[in-house]
């Protein structure tokens, strides 16, 4: 996921 993205995908 990109830092600061408004739509965070499933982060570990």
From Swiss-Prot:
GO (cellular component) term, any one: chloroplast thylakoid
Keywords: Chloroplast, Plastid, Thylakoid
Top-rank taxon, per record: Eukaryota
Location(s), subcellular: Plastid, Chloroplast thylakoid
Note: On the 2D-gel the determined pI of this protein is: 5.3, its MW is: 18.2 kDa.
Protein name per Swiss-Prot or TrEMBL: Unknown protein from spot 106 of 2D-PAGE of thylakoid
